[in-house]
Curated annotation (Swiss-Prot):
The active site is at K38. GO terms for biological process: biotin biosynthetic process. ATP binds at residues 13-18, 55, 116-119, 176-177, 205-207. Its main location: cytoplasm. The lineage of its organism: Bacteria, Pseudomonadati, Pseudomonadota, Gammaproteobacteria, Enterobacterales. This is ATP-dependent dethiobiotin synthetase BioD 1. Mg(2+) binds at T17, D55, E116. It comes from Salmonella typhi. One of its GO terms (molecular function) is magnesium ion binding. It catalyses: (7R,8S)-7,8-diammoniononanoate + CO2 + ATP = (4R,5S)-dethiobiotin + ADP + phosphate + 3 H(+). Its cofactor is Mg(2+).
Amino acid sequence: MTKRYFVTGTDTEVGKTVASCALLQAATQLGYQTVGYKPVASGSEMTTDGLRNSDALALQRNSSLPQPYSAINPYTFAEPTSPHIASADEGRAIDAAVLSRGLRTLEAQADWVLTEGAGGWFTPLSATLTFADWVQTEQLPVILVVGVKLGCINHAMLTALAVEQAGLPLVGWIANDMQPPGARHGEYLATLRRVIPAPLLGEIPWLGVSPSQAATGQYLDLSPLERA
């Protein structure tokens, strides 16, 4: 049976893609046929191949099972803004059925599929649909990425509570160091360990620029996912 997970974050720009690439690397090292899925991405650049999003490209590079870009990222928008705004501006509605069909296609080929969200847990995809709604429909186990910075404890607790209220399993969380560790770093991590009701899969240290291109799988331990 295919293992499937959804990666969400405490906010936008907290390292979801860095963590997702690390997860794909670690799962590949365990022998899985892996693929990353970024169903909706805003903030893309025009290339000779069309609009391309850097996060989706990173997932494509770190998947062990080669896939065309369109399979990794069915909805690509140019402006780096909330997907429901970008889709309205471009006159291209986001259809939840398209997201689900894309996921089914990948699940039929890989045995470890990781879906990365956009922004935070409740990011709107339309006036009536959030990413959380779709994840709940798909019943995906959730992995939370916490960007370790001031305010992250509150954001982590709120997100974990929202996942719980959606009736979904929070199967793990990842600490992503967004800057060199400060004086209170250890206390932040200790508090996060205490208040997040899920196992810590690992801490990705501050790596500077282009962390999604680094060998980050080494920082994770997926054994809690294997036991779940």
